[in-house]
Design a protein with these regions (language model features):
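Intrinsic-disorder/low-complexity, polar/charged segments enriched in Ser/Thr/Lys/Arg/Asp/Glu/Gln
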Residues: 1-5, 60
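Compact, glycine-rich, soluble single-domain proteins
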Residues: 7, 11-58
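C-terminal structural segments of small proteins and small subunits
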Residues: 56-89
């Protein structure tokens, strides 16, 4: 299992479009990917759960990945978050 803190860096936080990109990324992998914010944990492969986290810019989220391709899955999620979900602002 890989567990690490990541900081949401994009201006609008984990809004619908960013959540959809995260779901698309998570679904490429077999591993279980979960995000935790403020004592609430959700499956990264479900958009509604991600949106309900309410993670805003500069909020810290915990990412937990477990499974056969956990290293690749974590790196993909980390890159997406660090690249501000490919948003311009």
């Amino acid at each position: 299992m890989i567990q690490k803190h990541l900081t949401i860096q994009n201006k609008l936080g984990l809004h619908t479009r960013a959540a959809a990109k995260l779901v698309d990324t998570a679904k490429k992998f077999q591993s279980k990917i979960e995000l935790t914010h403020r004592d609430r944990t959700v499956d990264a492969k479900g958009i509604m759960g991600l949106i309900t986290l309410g993670a805003q810019k500069d909020n810290v989220i915990d990412v937990m990945v477990s499974g056969e391709d956990e290293a690749e899955a974590f790196l993909a999620v980390e890159k997406l978050v660090n690249d501000k979900f490919h948003e311009k602002e």
